[in-house]
């Protein structure tokens, strides 16, 4: 896997920029100071938002859309026969998958990676809001918009970068997590792991071993199995949690606890 250097300004073209995931990446790359262009098969709210932000986004795929790009990033849905991908290969412009560009972004900050079968977006959103309220000015790429901020992608001046770690394609192993958070571990996306749950658990072990700080949900058996293998801080409602939630009260749009 090629991880490009994004410390200097680049001209980056995104194929499939209208999807939520690639749109978030485009947003962050633009805020980092790179010249970002893109294309998608049709107009949509993400395309419109990127245009409003100042990016040139084409509708339809054509070799001419590459312009003077020196780096091309493509979504998982884009085939090698795509005319823009073929043109980039002919011009020897590096073509990266989403799983290549995310580690390059995370390398520019201290990374907090939220991994797990479920709950990544919710946990990442709560963490982002907590850090914003604490004036830590975090950057983040989250799988959904944070309502209070109006975006799921922010590049700010603080030292921390929050990102969801996807185990479905092993991307979480290359994000350079300084702090690793695991919400739960269940047998999912096993096609990536030869249909072997043990291989999935081994990947999670590799993920947390590389981090300086590990945080696990004490309520999940899979996360606790991981915590026994690689100890860390635990949280949840379970009595054995290091940080335990008690006196839980649920409101219409909120949950409070001690």
Where in this protein do the model-derived segments appear?
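Short beta-strand "acidic-cap" motif of Rossmann-like dinucleotide-binding folds
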Residues: 35-40, 139-141, 162, 234
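ATP-dependent carboxylate-amine ligase
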Residues: 1-56, 68, 72, 88-93, ...
